[in-house]
From Swiss-Prot:
Protein name: Maximins-S type D
Residues recorded with modification Lysine amide: K118, K223, K258
Presence of the UniProt keyword Signal in the record: yes
Residues carrying Asparagine amide: N83, N153, N188
Cellular component, GO annotation: extracellular region
Originating species: Bombina maxima (Giant fire-bellied toad)
Length: 270
């Protein structure tokens, strides 16, 4: 009898603690959205979707497993952000991604990793990074989950490779059209109607200033290689160490915007 009573009490204590912890995590996520510290990722306009249990499991799985060879740099970025620094092995991967010529279309992600590998994160940034890894309310990045799901076999199919090369070579990806292309080619009917509405909304509206850097990066990389000026920018982002948190994205926008933005895009940035 006493043993059963002990088990019952332990169950209620554990259950109550789990619910309290869940409430705290969600409250912290809401605080991130309200306080405006995530303006670079525009969480306020991307909070329409909730992750399914399957997607959440994938997100947690991506942090721990090492078999996702095609997108290991994403996993490494999460790991590097959660610890505040990069290990020697992670640094080797970053250098490998830079030197080998097969990742031309995604070199901007390599630059992001490199820029973060030497920069320091503030305590607030560190809390956000850890929160993004663990919490289940990371609503605005389901498209990344879809992309990872499609590419999680460790290599690209011929069709996926063609898409990547197409995104690099053609210069017609304005706004968020490149995201739509990726989603259309990779999702295979896995997106809900609400998610599709969000994607279309991101393409048509001009209020997503925090993601315009992606457009600029694709435009700058549209020839399959970097110019000397662009290479200098990448090296500068790596060496100067002043990019705390995600400020390097802002710096990249400013550096790439000179002479590369249309009048309409310049107006959007103001």
């Amino acid at each position: 009898m006493n043993f059963n009573y002990f088990i019952l009490v332990l169950f209620f204590i554990t259950s109550g603690h789990a619910k309290s912890e869940t409430r705290e995590v969600h409250q912290e996520a809401e605080n991130h959205i309200k306080r405006g510290s995530n303006t670079g990722f525009n969480f306020k306009t991307l909070d329409k979707e909730k992750r399914s249990a399957e997607e959440q499991n994938l997100a947690e799985h991506l942090v721990t497993r090492g078999s996702n060879k095609g997108f290991n740099f994403m996993v490494d970025m999460i790991n590097a952000l959660s610890n505040g620094k990069r290990s020697a092995e992670e640094q080797d991967l970053a250098e490998d991604l830079v030197t080998r010529g097969s990742n031309k279309g995604f070199n901007f992600m390599v630059d992001m990793i490199q820029a973060l590998s030497k920069g320091k994160r503030s305590a607030e940034d560190q809390d956000l990074a850890e929160d993004l890894v663990t919490r289940g309310s990371n609503k605005g990045f389901n498209f990344m989950v879809d992309m990872i799901q499609a590419l999680s076999n460790g290599k690209r199919s011929a069709e996926e490779q063609d898409l990547a090369e197409h995104l690099v070579t053609r210069g017609s990806n304005k706004g968020f059209n490149f995201m739509v292309d990726m989603i259309n080619a990779l999702s295979n009917g896995k997106r809900s109607a609400e998610e599709q509405d969000l994607v279309e909304d991101l393409v048509t509206r001009r209020s997503n200033k925090g993601f315009n850097f992606m457009v600029d990066m694709i435009q700058a990389l549209s020839k399959g290689k970097r110019s000397a000026e662009e290479q200098d920018l990448a090296e500068d982002l790596v060496t100067r160490g002043s990019n705390k948190g995600f400020n390097f994205m802002v710096d990249m926008i400013q550096a790439l915007s000179k002479g590369k933005r249309s009048a309409e895009q310049e107006k959007d940035m103001k």
